[in-house]
Amino acid sequence: MPNAPRKKTAAKKTTSKSKKASVPQGNSASRLIDQRIKELGDWRGEMLAKLRAVIKQADPDAIEEWKWDVPVWSHDGLICTGESYKQIVKLTFAKGASLADPSHLFNSSLEGNTRRAIDFHEGEKIDEKALKALIQAAVTANTSRARR
């Protein structure tokens, strides 16, 4: 496992002790997400907060986690991650390529055969109805796989 020491070193440099490993579900992850939103302090924080609210409305049973130094939402498997960059906030759906997207929300990571993502830019409105449908489709896909 040559990569294991490198990951541990990188985690020490970029994250606090509480974030070193994947934080299990519950309040700790929720607090880290709150902290990320506050740290961003601009339109990206507002967008991430809105997206978080839409995810929770679409699936009140979604579990908030903190993995890979980003917010993660799951329900019987990964639903999506919420990443923030200088110019975008990105929701990456782990199994997005297998989801129907009739509203054509996916606009990033389109070339792969597993993930799909939605890039949100400053001032952009969220199509909440379509996003909720996509989140619910991801949950349905996860729960149907979990039952097998």
Question: How does the language model describe each region?
Answer:
Residues 1-148:
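Charge-dense, helix-prone N-terminal extensions
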